[in-house]
């Protein structure tokens, strides 16, 4: 009997992982089905929704990402943030466990940074973002998210929190990636906001 709670937790975690994997596959398939020209239009709409709506002071460090596969292209949004004084950075994958955020400068060339991504090279300054634009597979209206399965962002956020930092997390997705309910566990890291082509939604934690 003493083992039952432990076994129940293991079963619940297994079911949760299976559900997340199914949702991830389904929502990414929907994202992949968006025609390229439509994806561009939706990405530009995101820049319009959030370009001025996100409050930050000049010098604030904001991490974005260079789009791969069928991700939204947030480069227009990042350009708007830069014009307002943000310091931009993008992730570089060091290994299967670790990403760092390298400063993105217009004058710096981009190089391959792992898993099909591109960004500044090793000579770039490594920054700790205060606002993070986070790609994802699926999300719900509570701010719970499903990533790509590698856990890179979760570990990066964990390292920032160990430093005493609490970056604001803004999920980047298309409307088709929303689900009714993401199975969540106590250790999961939730979003503070979500940006889609329909608009920008802030959760209470953005202000808190």
What kind of region is each of these model predictions?
Residues 2-18, 22, 32-33, 123-132, ...:
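Surface-exposed, charge/polar-rich loops and edge strands
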């Amino acid at each position: 009997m003493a083992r039952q709670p432990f076994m129940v937790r293991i079963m619940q975690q297994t079911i949760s992982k299976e559900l997340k994997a199914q949702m991830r596959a389904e929502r990414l398939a929907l994202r992949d089905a968006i025609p390229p020209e439509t994806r561009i239009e939706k990405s530009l709409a995101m820049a319009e929704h959030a370009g001025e709506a996100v409050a930050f002071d000049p010098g604030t460090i904001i991490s974005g990402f260079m789009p791969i596969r069928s991700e939204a292209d947030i480069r227009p949004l990042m350009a708007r943030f830069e014009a307002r004084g943000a310091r931009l950075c993008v992730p570089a994958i060091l290994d299967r466990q670790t990403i760092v955020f390298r400063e993105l400068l217009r004058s710096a060339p981009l190089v391959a940074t792992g898993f099909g991504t591109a960004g500044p090279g090793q000579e770039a300054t490594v920054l700790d973002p205060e606002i993070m634009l986070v790609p994802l597979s699926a999300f719900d209206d509570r701010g719970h998210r499903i990533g790509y399965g590698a856990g890179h962002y979760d570990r990066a956020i964990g390292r920032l929190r160990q430093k005493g930092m609490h970056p604001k997390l803004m999920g980047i997705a298309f409307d088709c990636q929303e689900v009714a309910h993401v199975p969540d566990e106590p250790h999961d890291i939730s979003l503070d906001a979500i940006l889609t082509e329909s608009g920008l939604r802030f959760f209470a934690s953005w202000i808190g």
